[in-house]
């Protein structure tokens, strides 16, 4: 990370100028980060081995926290099939961050395992000690040393004007404004501490179709959240009143399986979903996902 780039912690969703709604609502918690990969099982195993986490809601995802089948749900990395995704670096969702107790030891471990390290450990000012790596499919990974907040830690966005839209993000997705190790912005406390950082970038490509495709929030009441965001001028890219997705989904098999697609189904304590999508004016693709049974439906 450049020492001259300004960073801000934000709740992601640049859509429009700040608009003050007349009513308030319960801000949805951050839910998941979606990565495009050519083969899901291999990607899941790579992250479990090199980054950490545990079994997620279904076999195509990794959870960072215990899966209980009820709110609050643990943060998850979700893998999706794509044969032509492009690297995430320089896009609206540039990188995903994970925290470790000893960064130097972790970087050495990754190097010994053949993981590509693109920037060695460094520390600038008050910021965390950090390094950058890249997974085999083009996702840029920031590694930080933050012993008090281990695991899935943050995402880094490239947006046009973080300062001008911080208040809008707080309105849309809650969180606490704070100065965090020299990074100004917002932090989430729903599932421990989680951050979304952003740096100014007028040229970032839209995230959709890249290695980090989108980020997601998990509202308890999807309809209420959608209606509230409409008062802020949000334009959605999918049906805003979706049916519940079945609790099973197809994922692709590896070459050793002849490329066959397999059906992964949720366990009895896992949940069907309702999902809507939107893309911000900065090109950040956003998903809103309602876990129906956990929401009491």
Where on the chain are the PLM-derived regions?
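Bacterial N-terminal signal peptides
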Residues: 5-17
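Amphipathic N-proximal alpha-helical interface segments
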Residues: 76-84, 141-145, 198-202
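Short, P/G- and charge-enriched loop/turn segments at secondary-structure junctions
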Residues: 83-85, 202-204, 262-266
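Core segments of cupin and vicinal oxygen chelate
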Residues: 25-27, 31-76, 105, 122-132, ...
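Long, low-complexity, intrinsically disordered C-terminal regions of large eukaryotic nuclear proteins involved
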Residues: 169, 201, 243-247
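Vicinal oxygen chelate
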Residues: 22-25, 28-38, 58, 63-66, 85-157, 179-189, ...
């Amino acid at each position: 990370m450049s020492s001259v780039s300004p960073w801000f912690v934000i709740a992601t969703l640049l859509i429009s100028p700040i608009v003050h709604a007349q009513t308030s609502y319960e801000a949805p918690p951050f839910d998941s980060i979606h990565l495009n990969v050519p083969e899901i099982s291999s990607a899941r195993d790579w992250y479990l081995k090199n980054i950490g986490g545990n079994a997620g809601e279904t076999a195509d995802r990794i959870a960072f926290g215990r899966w209980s089948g009820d709110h609050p749900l643990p943060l998850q990395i979700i893998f999706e099939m794509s044969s032509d995704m492009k690297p995430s670096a320089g896009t609206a969702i540039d990188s995903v961050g994970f925290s470790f107790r000893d960064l130097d030891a972790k970087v050495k471990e990754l190097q010994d395992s053949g993981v590509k390290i693109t920037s060695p450990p460094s520390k600038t000012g008050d910021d965390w000690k950090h390094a950058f790596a890249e997974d085999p499919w083009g996702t840029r990974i920031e590694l930080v040393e933050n012993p008090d907040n281990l695991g899935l830690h943050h995402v880094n966005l490239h947006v046009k004007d973080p300062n001008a839209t911080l208040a809008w993000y707080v309105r849309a997705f809650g969180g606490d404004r704070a100065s965090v190790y020299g990074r100004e912005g917002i932090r989430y406390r729903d599932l421990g501490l989680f951050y979304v950082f952003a740096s100014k970038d007028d040229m970032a490509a839209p995230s959709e179709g890249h290695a980090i495709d989108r980020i997601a929030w998990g509202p308890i009441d999807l309809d209420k959240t959608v209606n509230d965001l409409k008062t802020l001028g949000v334009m959605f890219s999918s049906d805003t009143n979706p049916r519940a997705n079945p609790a099973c989904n197809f994922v692709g098999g590896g070459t050793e399986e002849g490329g066959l697609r397999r059906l992964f189904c949720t366990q009895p304590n896992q949940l069907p979903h309702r999902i809507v999508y939107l893309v911000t004016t900065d090109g950040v693709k956003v998903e809103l996902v309602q876990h129906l049974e956990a929401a009491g439906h």
